[in-house]
Design a protein with these regions (language model features):
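Structural signature of the two symmetry-related core transmembrane helices
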Residues: 89-103
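Multi-pass alpha-helical transporter architecture, strongest
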Residues: 182-207
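Paired small-residue
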Residues: 112-120
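Juxtamembrane intracellular "pre-TM" segments in multi-pass secondary transporters
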Residues: 2-27
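A late C-terminal transmembrane helix in Major Facilitator Superfamily
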Residues: 139-184, 195
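Intracellular juxtamembrane helix-capping segments at the cytosolic ends
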Residues: 126-140
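Extracytoplasmic gate region of multi-pass secondary transporters
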Residues: 20-74
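Helix-to-loop junctions at the C-terminal end of transmembrane segments
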Residues: 73-86
């Protein structure tokens, strides 16, 4: 049975309005950048660590603790976020861990790489958890939350899909990992800025 035209209009309303929402775009861009950070790290960290002097087995193994602490961050951070009036500092601090992680891998000693990788794991997991919980925290209705989720995840993962490829291209272009690591550290800073903005109290109806 066909749905009445009025029902279809009401159902599509939140999805159309969401694209004109400043808050929705902040959440979407934050979602995209934090996804780039995660996928770049799991795609290229073993190669980076090997070039820094770590043996292949140890470099590959380093992803395991990173993903474990990432899972913990993605589970725990939304619990803290739900108890806060706004999440701007939680989000900025989580992304700052990625700045320290990538920056440390870029400029620090390989002996400190395990520490920086753990910080990166906590940061990437926490930012992911916050991005997901923003779908409900920045919405007044389930329809808005669904529309925001669709917008943020579709655009966010499209952005993320290009991240590892461009990171590898920068390596090929420059002939070293310093340039792409400097760029991804910069992307981490941008993620913190958008995360701070997306974490401020408000919803998708705000202008």
């Amino acid at each position: 049975t066909a749905r009445p035209q009025s029902d279809l209009s009401q159902a599509s309303g939140p999805r159309l309005r969401i694209w004109r929402s400043r808050v929705a775009w902040l959440v979407t861009i934050f979602m995209g950048f934090q996804s780039i950070l995660f996928y770049v790290s799991i795609s290229w960290l073993p190669d980076i660590l090997q070039e820094r002097g770590m043996n292949a087995e140890q470099a590959g193994w380093m992803l395991s603790p990173m993903q474990l602490v990432s899972m913990a961050g993605s589970f725990l951070m939304p619990l803290f976020a739900a108890r806060s009036d706004n999440q701007k500092w939680l989000t900025a601090a989580s992304a700052a861990l990625c700045v320290i992680g990538f920056g440390g891998i870029w400029a620090g000693s390989v002996s400190l790489a395990p520490l920086f990788i753990l910080l990166l794991g906590v940061g990437s997991g926490s930012t992911f958890g916050l991005a997901i919980v923003f779908f409900s925290l920045r919405s007044r209705t389930t329809e808005q939350a669904s529309a925001l989720s669709g917008m943020a995840q579709s655009i966010g993962y499209i952005l993320a899909a290009f991240g590892p490829t461009l990171f590898g291209y920068l390596h090929d272009l420059s002939g070293n990992w310093d340039t792409p690591l400097a760029v991804i550290t910069g992307v981490s800073i941008i993620t913190a800025l958008f995360g701070y903005a997306a974490g401020r109290k408000g919803d998708v109806d705000a202008r």
